[in-house]
């Protein structure tokens, strides 16, 4: 039985405009176990979904998210006629799905005030606490989340090696590590992390050979732009 979760990175972003409702809905339709997405705050305090601090790469507009109101942001095309969604839109869609929702707080470049508290309030509002894991490259932010509510699951993102990652996560008080997948391609590292009771959700895995290897190693979740490919890998391994 394969227990590795299939987590759609920015939705089904390999085929549809990333971090749009279209990408999220397509990920759910093809059978993903969860969605990973990215949160920023607008000038008027609305939590919105976008990977970058600016809208230049993903829309037909330009400038920093923090300098726009939410209404102003909705004027831009994020691909296929889609708009930049609010967290409310995504949570309203996900509230009855019983799927994982990985909310990455994008506060490692711009230290948005109250992003942690505002995100937690939305988790409560939509009754999604048991479905959500909050992650960030800003590990101090994850400690702040735990201070607000120790029962909310947190994941530490990292793209370069951490000494004794399992012990580090335990010391920080996190539930999971979210490493760049190439950092945990050996059984010893996986075992060390799991020995400390820490979950491992790796990013961003888009090739079937790596997906299979990581499943064999026992990671808990794989974050991918192509949840359709990962679904195929999991089904083939399950059929063996």
PLM feature spans:
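Phosphate-group recognition and catalysis centered on beta-loop-alpha active-site segments
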Residues: 1-240
């Amino acid at each position: 039985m394969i227990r590795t979760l299939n987590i759609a990175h920015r939705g089904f972003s390999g085929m549809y405009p990333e971090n749009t409702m279209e990408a999220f809905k397509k990920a759910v339709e093809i059978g993903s176990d969860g969605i990973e997405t990215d949160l920023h705050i607008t000038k008027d305090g609305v939590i919105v979904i976008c990977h970058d601090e600016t809208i230049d790469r993903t829309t037909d507009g330009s400038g920093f998210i923090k300098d726009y109101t939410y209404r102003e942001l909705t004027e831009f095309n994020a691909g296929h006629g889609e708009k930049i969604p609010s967290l409310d839109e995504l949570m309203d869609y996900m509230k009855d799905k019983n799927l994982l929702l990985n909310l990455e707080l994008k506060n490692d470049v711009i230290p948005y005030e109250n992003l942690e508290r505002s995100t937690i309030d939305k988790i409560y509002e939509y009754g999604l606490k048991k479905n959500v894991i909050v992650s960030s490259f800003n590990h101090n932010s994850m400690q702040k989340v735990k201070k607000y509510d120790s029962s909310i699951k947190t994941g530490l993102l990292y793209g370069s090696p951490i000494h004794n990652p399992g012990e580090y996560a335990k010391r920080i008080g996190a539930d999971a590590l979210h490493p760049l997948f190439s950092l945990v391609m050996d059984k010893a590292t996986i075992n060390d992390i799991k020995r400390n009771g820490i979950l491992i959700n790796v990013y961003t895995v888009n090739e079937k050979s790596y997906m299979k290897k990581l499943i064999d190693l026992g990671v808990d979740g794989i974050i991918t732009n192509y949840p359709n490919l990962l679904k195929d890998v999991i089904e083939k391994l399950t059929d063996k």
